[in-house]
């Protein structure tokens, strides 16, 4: 296969389809989503058979249990796909919304209209459910999509692509509006991320090595996040009860997510009251504690152990595991400075009963999501009321934070006049 020519053809078809899908009615887009949902339910056995072949190959290659679990399309996973498609169909369609309409002294009316981005390339790894999640959000937001999943899920993704195509056709929409790259050749990714004439934005969903490669090689703009080094700062004016609840959930609710707390900062004046019960709780749950000298002194005095001495690298690490770095700081100044120096601009929280300090933290911490008296685990499109998300961005342009339907759109200016000319 000539990968360059193949991907060029995919891009050309996507660009053509993007113009059609951009003007599609809400009813047509929702009908397509419902048709795909029905098709998944109808062909569940065929989907599971295709997926079983992917899973067998993954096991033969020695992939671990966690990888195989992400790859597997269980009955529950298929049900979640169907529910997700129907949920996206219920979301308000942002396309065509008019906002900020104002009359100017010249007599013209100026405002903004929400429009699709165009063609979105999604690059992801072993989760075939992303094929449906991404296709649904891009379709509802009026975008064409090129989906490049991991080679290990090729048969699963191909089977899902067939059903998506059927759903589009049933609604009278171009099947080229959602295309799954039908090759495992890594050169396809290299071509996709450089096709600026056909692709408007890339959304990568994968591990750090994938994101780093795309940062170095992509010519197409990206909506991405590299790391989720999330902090909770417990202020010396915090409620101890709130601090325990927030810090427990932020770390132990799930270890492998990008919005899990990786570093705990505690004000010196409240450290014994907070770290003593927290340290015991974390050790009971099997969390390894990597601590600075001051935190070690407090925890050892409380009989908490074993402890590991933190290094500078620990403050820069996204563990995605039951490991937590702990540092005692002098106060909010030092906490904000530490977060802005070592954090990844993803999600950070303060626990405090002081309103002025809370507002200062919100203003000065340079992250996509900043929270007061709440767990970092809330940094999620569903929890934010977006309905669904395609990912989380810790960049400042174009979207920031959880990216839902609006994050897959742009605003263009519109001018309404009555024959006016500029003087």
Swiss-Prot record:
Per UniProt, the enzyme's principal EC class comes to: oxidoreductase
Q: Which reaction does it catalyse?
A: L-glutamate 5-semialdehyde + phosphate + NADP(+) = L-glutamyl 5-phosphate + NADPH + H(+)
A single Gene Ontology MF term assigned here is: glutamate-5-semialdehyde dehydrogenase activity
List GO BP terms, alphabetically: L-proline biosynthetic process
- Spell out the subcellular localization from the entry: Cytoplasm
| Entry keywords, A to Z | Amino-acid biosynthesis, Cytoplasm, NADP, Oxidoreductase, Proline biosynthesis
Known EC number: 1.2.1.41
Q: What is its main location?
A: cytoplasm
Q: Which HAMAP family match?
A: ProA
User: PANTHER family from the xrefs?
Assistant: DELTA-1-PYRROLINE-5-CARBOXYLATE SYNTHASE, GLUTAMATE SEMIALDEHYDE DEHYDROGENASE
Which protein family is it in? Answer: Belongs to the gamma-glutamyl phosphate reductase family.
Q: Write out the function statement from the record.
A: Catalyzes the NADPH-dependent reduction of L-glutamate 5-phosphate into L-glutamate 5-semialdehyde and phosphate. The product spontaneously undergoes cyclization to form 1-pyrroline-5-carboxylate.
Name this protein carries in UniProt: Gamma-glutamyl phosphate reductase
Question: Organism source for this protein?
Answer: Burkholderia pseudomallei (strain K96243)
């Amino acid at each position: 296969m000539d990968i360059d020519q193949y991907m060029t053809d995919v891009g050309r078809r996507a660009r053509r389809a993007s113009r059609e899908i951009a003007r599609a009615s809400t009813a047509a887009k929702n009908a397509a989503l419902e048709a795909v949902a029905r098709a998944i339910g109808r062909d569940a056995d065929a989907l599971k058979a295709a997926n079983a072949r992917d899973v067998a190959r993954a096991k033969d290659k020695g992939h671990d249990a966690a990888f195989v679990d992400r790859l597997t399309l269980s009955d529950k996973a298929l049900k979640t796909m169907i529910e997700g498609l129907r949920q996206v169909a219920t979301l308000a369609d942002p396309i065509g919304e008019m906002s900020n309409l104002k009359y100017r002294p010249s007599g013209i009316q100026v405002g903004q209209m929400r429009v699709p981005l165009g063609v979105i390339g999604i690059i992801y790894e072993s989760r075939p459910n992303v094929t449906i999640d991404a296709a649904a959000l891009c379709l509802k937001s009026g975008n064409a999509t090129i989906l490049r999943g991991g080679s290990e899920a090729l048969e699963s993704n191909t089977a899902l692509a067939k059903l998506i195509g059927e759903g589009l056709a049933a609604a009278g929409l171009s099947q080229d509006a959602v295309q799954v790259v039908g090759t495992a050749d890594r050169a396809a990714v290299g071509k996709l991320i450089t096709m600026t004439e056909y692709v408007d934005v890339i959304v990568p969903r994968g591990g750090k090595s994938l994101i780093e490669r795309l940062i170095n090689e992509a010519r197409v703009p990206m909506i991405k996040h590299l790391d989720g080094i999330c902090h909770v700062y417990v202020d010396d004016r915090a409620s101890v009860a709130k601090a325990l609840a927030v810090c427990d959930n932020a770390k132990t609710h799930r270890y492998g997510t990008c919005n899990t707390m990786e570093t705990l900062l505690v004000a010196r004046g409240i450290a014994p009251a907070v770290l003593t019960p927290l340290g015991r709780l974390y050790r009971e749950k099997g969390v390894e504690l990597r601590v600075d000298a001051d935190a070690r002194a407090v925890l050892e005095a409380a009989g908490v152990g074993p402890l590991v001495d933190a290094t500078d690298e620990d403050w820069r690490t996204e563990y995605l595991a039951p490991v937590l770095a702990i540092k005692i700081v002098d106060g909010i100044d030092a906490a904000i400075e530490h977060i802005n120096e070592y954090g990844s601009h993803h999600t950070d929280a303060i626990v405090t009963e002081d309103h002025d300090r809370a507002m200062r933290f919100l203003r000065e911490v340079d992250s996509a999501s900043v929270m007061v008296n709440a767990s970092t685990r809330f940094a999620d499109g569903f929890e934010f009321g977006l309905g669904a998300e395609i990912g989380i961005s810790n960049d400042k342009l174009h979207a920031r934070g959880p990216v839902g339907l609006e994050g897959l759109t742009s605003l263009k200016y519109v001018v309404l006049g009555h024959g006016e000319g500029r003087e």
